[in-house]
Design a protein with these regions (language model features):
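Acidic/His-enriched low-complexity segments
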Residues: 1-215
Length: 215
């Protein structure tokens, strides 16, 4: 998707990909057999335009489909996780390259409903040619596909997610902006309130389930 605080498309050179560059999406897609991600609630502080950083709280509602597991992994690239809560309980986690591994407080049960809260922040990533999050031309905007990145899904550069073409979820976006920038986003605007000075908080709801690269 192309949204957030404005939208511009850049014409960029293409890059030929070799056969050996192909990436096996099987393990990523297989997660959707074990977990059903229902909803993402994303609280994003996008007020640091000049520092080109963001702070986020992702609240993720999901259902366990296959019990017995004690850990699960999410896609998250470039950004650093501060803490994770599982149904309100702080849990251990680790980050390895573009994966966030979260330890469940107890073996998971089939049918269990979980609210996962992830606090994170840093400088969001982008593709060398086209895609990802940009701070440019007095805008902050996101392009959901990395043109030369394998795999190409780019939800993971701005929030923890199941970043594949199979999993679909609904979304709530809560975007904090400043310096005259106003959010333009997926879904419909619920409210926009002033937090003092030139800082705004806008809330958007998207009730139609979509994959991460469109979010």
């Amino acid at each position: 998707g192309c949204h957030a605080l404005g939208c511009k498309h850049h014409v960029a050179p293409t890059k030929s990909l070799l056969v050996e560059d192909n990436f096996d999406m099987g393990p990523s897609i297989a997660r959707s057999d074990s977990f059903d991600v229902v909803h993402y609630d994303l609280m994003l502080d996008m007020t640091d335009y000049w520092g080109q950083t963001m702070q986020g709280l992702a609240t993720i509602d999901f259902t366990v489909l296959q019990g017995g597991g004690t850990t699960m992994w999410w896609d998250l690239e470039s950004l650093v996780v501060d803490s994770v809560h599982w149904n309100g309980e702080a849990v251990t986690f680790s980050q390895l390259e573009s994966q966030l591994h979260v330890d469940a407080p107890a073996p998971m049960q089939a049918g269990e409903q979980v609210v996962l809260e992830v606090w994170y922040g840093g400088e969001p990533g982008s593709d060398p040619y086209w895609g990802g999050m940009y701070f440019a031309s007095d805008l902050i905007y996101n392009l959901g596909i990395g043109l030369t990145t394998i795999p190409p899904n780019f939800g993971r550069v701005w929030y923890p997610c199941f970043d594949n073409f199979v999993e679909r979820a609904t979304y709530t976006y809560r975007l904090r902006t400043a310096d005259g920038r106003r959010a333009h986003n997926q879904g419909h605007l619920i409210e926009e309130v002033s937090l003092g000075g030139d800082t705004l908080l806008s809330t958007w709801e998207l009730d139609h389930p979509i994959p991460t690269h469109l979010s």
